């Protein structure tokens, strides 16, 4: 048995199995199946291949370098600084031209600060006092400007005052100008040079037009039809981001400049264009003290005696973040095969759904279910079922024939001819079956 089973298993390896198809003449289910096929085919062709370009291999590991330059000058005339010209070296931080840069639009200037003793600002809670013991010498003022000296400075007829501190004096004033300090900043220009590379396809490009005429960049400006002149007017960038220049220049803010590269490398390289979008990244909260963007910096000097002093500047301005992202695609047979296979699998899912409708949901589901599925049993089960049917058939014949079939005597009696029955009834008196044979033969 083991050898025969092994031989049968080996021979079964060369068997070919195929499916049996049942054609259901049901127009509703047939129409549903064709609609599913058409929908899946439209999804595969339109969405997967035409819109998502599923036949392409994609590279999203974009390598990018950004160089920025700001140009423009502003003129101011104040009591603290006098007449002054502000150029790029004054209002752009940092000066290296990176992808993140800051343009000063408003200033609070505190000139001629020297290290000395003076009263802490009244708005500092830790600097308030009523007597000298409230000001511990050598203790830094929390959220303040210096170190306490141990003295409490009070104005005339006032019970409370502020601690004397050792700091850069005079202290910075907290008042902010009602108008932007550098109004001309709205007309400054920003030059953004971006180089990108997709390493998988060894494809490189820049957002600057490849021309030898240097005057091109001095006269052109960015526009909807001029993507290869990345020179932006600062006020236009603020407007495209949905903000007002006067508001953001007064308190400061953060603007995002996004450069998107979506390149179809099945086409010419000249068809790969940068796309720009602008947005404000910080949340402008009108009732919040944390709105805006500012920081402090100082410029240090020495007088004739060699004593150091400085000019403190609290700068409000606009921070620009240049962000670059993108992807490149090129035809490849592998994603094409994968997406086509996925579409074929979806076709099978449509057939499965129609099978469920056919055998479970419509009115004639039992009829179609019987036609689709056949019940096949094993050999032993078939033999046992045949024996059961045979025994059941014999029992039914006995029940229909009457009690005579249950024993052999009755059966023989039913099989006797009518003549025998009459002969036996005529000889009941002597019990002899054939009395003539029992008489002796007489000679004559």
UniProtKB/Swiss-Prot annotation:
GO terms for biological process: calcium ion transmembrane transport; chloride transport; nervous system development; osteoclast maturation; positive regulation of calcium ion import across plasma membrane; positive regulation of calcium ion transport into cytosol; positive regulation of calcium-mediated signaling; regulation of skeletal muscle tissue regeneration. Residues 52-319 are extracellular. Expressed at high levels in brain and immune system. Residues 378-444 are annotated as: Disordered. Residues 1-30, 363-444 are cytoplasmic. InterPro entries: P2X5_purnocptor, P2X_extracellular_dom_sf, P2X_purnocptor, P2X_RECEPTOR_CS. It catalyses: Na(+)(in) = Na(+)(out); Ca(2+)(in) = Ca(2+)(out); chloride(in) = chloride(out). The chain crosses the membrane at residues 31-51, 320-362. The keyword Transport applies. Belongs to the P2X receptor family. This is P2X purinoceptor 5. It comes from Homo sapiens (Human).
């Amino acid at each position: 048995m083991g050898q025969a089973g092994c031989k049968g298993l080996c021979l079964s390896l060369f068997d070919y199995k195929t499916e049996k198809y049942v054609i259901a003449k049901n127009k509703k289910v047939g129409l549903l199946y064709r609609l599913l096929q058409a929908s899946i085919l439209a999804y595969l062709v339109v969405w997967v291949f035409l819109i998502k370009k599923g036949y392409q291999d994609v590279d999203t590991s974009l390598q990018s370098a950004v160089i920025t330059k700001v140009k423009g000058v502003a003129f101011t005339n104040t009591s603290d600084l006098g007449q002054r010209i502000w150029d790029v070296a004054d209002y752009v931080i940092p000066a290296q031209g990176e992808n993140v840069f800051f343009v000063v639009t408003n200033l609070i200037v505190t000139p001629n600060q020297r290290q000395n003793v003076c009263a802490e600002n009244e708005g500092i809670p830790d600097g308030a006092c009523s007597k000298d013991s409230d000001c511990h010498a050598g203790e830094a003022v929390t959220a303040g400007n210096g170190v306490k000296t141990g003295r409490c400075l009070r104005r005339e007829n006032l019970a409370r005052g502020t601690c004397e501190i050792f700091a850069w004096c005079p202290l910075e004033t907290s008042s902010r100008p009602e108008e932007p300090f550098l109004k001309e900043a709205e007309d400054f220009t920003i030059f953004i040079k971006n180089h990108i590379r997709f390493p998988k396809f060894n494809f490189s490009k820049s957002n600057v037009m490849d021309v030898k005429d240097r005057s091109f960049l001095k006269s052109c400006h960015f526009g909807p039809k001029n993507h290869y002149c990345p020179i932006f007017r600062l006020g236009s960038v603020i407007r495209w981001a949905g903000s007002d220049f006067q508001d953001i220049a007064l308190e400061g803010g953060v603007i995002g400049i996004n450069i998107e590269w979506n390149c179809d490398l099945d086409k010419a390289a000249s068809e790969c264009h940068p796309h720009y979008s602008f947005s404000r990244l910080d949340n402008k909260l009108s009732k919040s003290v944390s709105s805006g963007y500012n920081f402090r910096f100082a410029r240090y000097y020495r007088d004739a005696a060699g004593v150091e002093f400085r000019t403190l500047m609290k700068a409000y301005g606009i921070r620009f973040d240049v962000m670059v992202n993108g992807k490149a695609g090129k035809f490849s047979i592998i994603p094409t095969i994968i997406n086509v296979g996925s579409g074929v699998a979806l076709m099978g899912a449509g057939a499965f759904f129609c099978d469920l409708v056919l055998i479970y949901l419509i009115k004639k589901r039992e009829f179609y279910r019987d036609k689709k599925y056949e019940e096949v049993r094993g050999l032993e089960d078939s033999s046992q079922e045949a024996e059961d049917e045979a025994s059941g058939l014999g029992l039914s014949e006995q029940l229909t024939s009457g009690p005579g079939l249950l024993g052999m005597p009755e059966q023989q009696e039913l099989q006797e001819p009518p003549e025998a029955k009459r002969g036996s009834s005529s000889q009941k008196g002597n019990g002899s079956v054939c009395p003539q044979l029992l008489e002796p033969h007489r000679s004559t």
